[in-house]
């Protein structure tokens, strides 16, 4: 990257002799199959779940997976809109949790899930609308993965250490920051 930066700063970019191409692939079916591969759908209970997509990328995947699970989804800020008319889609910020909490209370949902705008992080709320800190979720996931694959490696955010490290040790796994 430093070399690219140097070339750009010195205007030393040489034209290429052959241009690349762009292709569009529908990766959603493979992604959904991957997600469902972690779940025994036959053992799932009917739940009412608030899903706050934050007007970001989560909505289309929620729509696609909806018929494959025995859940009722209460959709909040569901339509993708890059102008984010309902505010910054970051449920980690306390000030952005209100719509999810309100939907849990008004619908009697069993839990809530809110995603960030680019759909790479999700955050959970209990049936009372209380935010569940990420280290508890990472711990539950680590335990589940290590029960399925003892001695496995758990890659985690360095901000979420204590619980993950303890669980990895308990299940003979390796916590990697």
Residue ranges and their predicted role:
Residues 1-107:
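Gly/Ser/Thr-enriched, mixed-charge loops and adjacent short helices
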Residues 2-33, 37-39, 128-177:
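Proline/glycine-rich low-complexity loops and linkers
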Residues 39-45, 102-107, 116, 124, ...:
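Solvent-exposed alpha-helices and their adjacent loops that cap or buttress functional pockets
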Residues 55-59, 119-120, 160-162:
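Gly/Ser/Thr-rich loops at beta-strand to alpha-helix junctions
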Residues 60-64, 85-88, 122-127, 164-170:
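Short acidic, glycine/serine/threonine-rich loops at helix termini
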Residues 80-84, 121, 139-140, 162:
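Short gly/pro/ser/thr-enriched loop/turn and capping motifs at secondary-structure boundaries
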Residues 104-126, 131, 173-177:
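Glycine-rich phosphate-binding loop
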């Amino acid at each position: 990257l430093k070399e690219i930066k140097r070339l750009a700063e010195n205007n030393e970019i040489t034209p290429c002799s052959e241009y690349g191409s762009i292709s569009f692939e529908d990766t959603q079916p493979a992604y959904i199959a991957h997600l469902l591969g972690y779940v025994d759908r036959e053992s799932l209970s009917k739940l009412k779940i608030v899903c706050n997509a934050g007007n970001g990328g989560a909505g289309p995947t929620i729509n696609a997976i909806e018929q494959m699970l025995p859940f009722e989804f209460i959709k909040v800020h569901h339509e993708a809109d890059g102008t984010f008319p309902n505010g910054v889609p970051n449920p980690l910020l306390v000030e952005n949790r209100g719509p999810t909490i309100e939907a849990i209370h008004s619908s009697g949902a069993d839990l809530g899930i809110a995603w960030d705008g680019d759909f790479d992080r999700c955050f959970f709320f209990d049936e009372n609308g209380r935010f569940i800190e990420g280290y508890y979720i990472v711990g539950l996931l680590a335990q589940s993965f290590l029960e399925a694959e003892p001695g496995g490696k758990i890659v985690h955010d360095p901000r979420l250490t204590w619980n993950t490290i303890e669980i990895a040790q308990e299940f003979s796994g390796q916590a990697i920051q």
